[in-house]
Amino acid sequence: MMLEFSEVRLAPNFVDYMQAWEMQQKLHDAVVEGQAPSTVLLLEHAAVYTAGKRTEDHERPFDGTPVIPVDRGGKLTWHGPGQLVGYPIIALADPHAIREYVATLEDILIAVLAQFGIKGERVDGRAGIWLLADAKGPTRKIAAIGIRVHNGVTMHGFSLNCDNDLAPYGQIIACGITDAGATTMELETGRNISPAQVLPHIIKEFSAREATLIGAPAHEAVVPARATEGATQ
């Protein structure tokens, strides 16, 4: 099966988190059963905080803002306008190669950033994509990754800061990290870069890696019926 892409909604028609979560669940079940192709959902959320399973109480919003618990690995993060979110629902070619899948997501994000003149990096021991300390500031995070794999099919995914407001990060300990901040593509380049502008580049990079990502329909693969949390946030 070929990898498909679904542009759910971008600004100004932001997607409620729970609506997107229901879409993920239904699509995941269909991919597991071989009733739908592997698909990447691409969208912008209405503002929301979500908490992975490792989130601690002291990391939650200081003002008591509600947080939605989710079944990915990782900790607390924010999604909202100006941030491109991708939920790849993919029957993996190798259902056990979780680290390799996360590395592929990192490669995709790094390649997209490079097309806008931004040098994204991996940082040992920390998930996501970073900009290393330079004249513009200390090491800072520009993209988060948080996944779950169940029955050989992925859920959740990545978020890439395009032109979003960073103020919401000031209300939380994002991703459990206290010694680094966040940034956006707009801040790094001095140009307005919206999720709509970035989306075609994401599709291009996923498509280039399609052959290594996608396996047989999950219901045909021999996969233990268990969930696996991946490196996140």
From Swiss-Prot:
Record localization: Cytoplasm
Enzyme class label: transferase
Annotated ranges, domain BPL/LPL catalytic: 34-214
Record-linked SUPFAM superfamilies: Class II aaRS and biotin synthetases (SSF55681)
Alphabetical list of InterPro entries matching this protein: aa-tRNA-synth_II/BPL/LPL, BPL_LPL_catalytic, Octanoyltransferase, Octanoyltransferase_CS
Keyword Acyltransferase: yes
Catalytic activity line of the entry: octanoyl-[ACP] + L-lysyl-[protein] = N(6)-octanoyl-L-lysyl-[protein] + holo-[ACP] + H(+)
Function: Catalyzes the transfer of endogenously produced octanoic acid from octanoyl-acyl-carrier-protein onto the lipoyl domains of lipoate-dependent enzymes. Lipoyl-ACP can also act as a substrate although octanoyl-ACP is likely to be the physiological substrate.
Protein name: Octanoyltransferase
Species the sequence originates in: Renibacterium salmoninarum (strain ATCC 33209 / DSM 20767 / JCM 11484 / NBRC 15589 / NCIMB 2235)
